[in-house]
């Protein structure tokens, strides 16, 4: 059994990660660290886990007792932890924050998008889990980059559910504001753009165009629905072939020949992609569950690869809407 520890156990991504690991046939949770909830039952915070666990939060860190450590912490906290603690040399780490997503000589974290860096992830000791928007958008663009087709700016509009804002309440997460409402935020300046560009340039070194990304807040709890537009004269049939070929060995990305919707992916680790041509414009529709394929599900996917397990173990999930 893979023995796992979690630091930062009170948020939405942590709750989903706990649920996945509790039901993972090859994993045992040793501890869930949360200084603000130490001593409390996990179900005091994650009430959807009633009947599934008797675990309690702890402020202890028995790092020598685990094989893999997940960070579900606020941005900046993982880096502080790594700099201030003696982490066992052979301990595998999966960081769900954005601290190590950008390549640097200062760290050895692999960018953990399996559809891009599968081979590197399989041998990695430290993995940086991608952002939710970044995952959805990259999966819509990677086959084009692989075929050197990103020669102009990319237009992206993507809407996310309220869980994307985290568990702490804010002015834009209250039900009375969010319900029956929509708004944009961080237009052209979202923090996930640099990691998207980094990945595209990894496949297409000549890529130097803009990602014109406008994020939207949706009035639903979870999921990301993105539309991407690029210009190309290549026929749709050839583009579909490129996408199917690129994702042929990936278990969670599926090219769908009819229009898609968010309910098809919520509560799964899938990404569905639909392609259309309108004149010289290619429309790419990509959708994921922000908490699973965009966070905790992808983290478990990375764990499976790091421990040489079949990649779908513990992740064969049914959409919650059907």
Curated annotation (Swiss-Prot):
Q: What is this enzyme's class at the first EC digit?
A: oxidoreductase
Where in or outside the cell? Cytoplasm
Q: What is the catalytic activity of this protein?
A: N-acetyl-L-glutamate 5-semialdehyde + phosphate + NADP(+) = N-acetyl-L-glutamyl 5-phosphate + NADPH + H(+)
A GO biological process held by the record: L-arginine biosynthetic process
Q: What is its main location?
A: cytoplasm
Q: What is this protein called?
A: N-acetyl-gamma-glutamyl-phosphate reductase
Q: Which InterPro entries match?
A: AGPR_AS, AGPR_type-1, NAD(P)-bd_dom_sf, NAGSA_dehydrogenase, Semialdehyde_DH_NAD-bd
> Which segments of the protein form a coiled coil according to its record?
none
Catalytic activity, EC: 1.2.1.38
Organism encoding this protein: Bacteroides thetaiotaomicron (strain ATCC 29148 / DSM 2079 / JCM 5827 / CCUG 10774 / NCTC 10582 / VPI-5482 / E50)
**HAMAP family associated with the record:** ArgC_type1 (MF_00150)
Q: Which residues participate directly in catalysis? A: 132
Q: In which pathway does it act?
A: Amino-acid biosynthesis; L-arginine biosynthesis; N(2)-acetyl-L-ornithine from L-glutamate: step 3/4
GO cellular component annotations of the record: cytoplasm
Q: Which family does it belong to?
A: Belongs to the NAGSA dehydrogenase family. Type 1 subfamily.
Could you give a GO molecular-function term held by this entry? Answer: NAD binding
- What is the protein's known function? Catalyzes the NADPH-dependent reduction of N-acetyl-5-glutamyl phosphate to yield N-acetyl-L-glutamate 5-semialdehyde.
* Alphabetical keyword list: Amino-acid biosynthesis, Arginine biosynthesis, Cytoplasm, NADP, Oxidoreductase
- Lineage top rank: taxon: Bacteria
């Amino acid at each position: 059994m893979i023995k796992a520890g979690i630091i930062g156990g009170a948020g939405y991504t942590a709750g989903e990660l706990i649920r996945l690991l509790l039901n993972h046939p090859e994993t045992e949770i040793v501890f869930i660290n949360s200084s603000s909830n130490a001593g409390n039952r996990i179900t005091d915070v994650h009430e959807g886990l009633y009947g599934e666990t008797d675990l309690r939060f702890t402020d202890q860190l028995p790092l020598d007792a685990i094989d893999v450590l997940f960070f579900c912490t606020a941005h900046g906290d993982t880096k502080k932890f790594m700099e201030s603690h003696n982490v066992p040399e052979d301990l595998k780490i999966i960081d769900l924050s954005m601290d190590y997503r950008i390549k640097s000589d200062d760290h050895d974290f692999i960018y953990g998008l399996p559809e891009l860096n599968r081979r590197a992830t399989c041998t990695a000791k430290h993995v940086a889990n991608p952002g939710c928007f970044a995952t959805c958008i990259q999966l819509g663009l990677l086959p084009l980059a692989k075929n050197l087709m990103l020669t102009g700016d990319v237009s992206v509009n993507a809407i996310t559910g309220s869980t994307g804002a985290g568990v702490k309440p804010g002015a834009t997460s209250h039900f009375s504001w969010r319900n029956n409402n929509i708004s944009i935020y961080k237009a052209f300046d979202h923090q996930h753009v640099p990691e998207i560009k980094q990945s595209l340039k990894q496949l297409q070194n000549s890529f130097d165009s803009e990602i014109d990304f406008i994020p939207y807040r949706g009035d639903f709890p979870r999921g990301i629905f993105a539309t991407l537009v690029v210009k190309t004269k290549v026929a749709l049939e050839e583009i579909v072939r490129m996408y199917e070929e690129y994702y042929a060995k990936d278990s969670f990305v599926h090219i769908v020949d009819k229009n898609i919707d968010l309910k098809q992916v919520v509560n799964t680790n899938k990404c569905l992609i639909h392609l259309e041509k309108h004149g010289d414009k290619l429309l790419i529709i990509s959708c994921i569950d922000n908490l699973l394929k965009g966070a905790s599900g992808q983290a478990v996917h990375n764990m499976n690869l790091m421990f040489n397990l079949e990649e779908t173990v513990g992740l064969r999930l049914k959409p919650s809407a059907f």
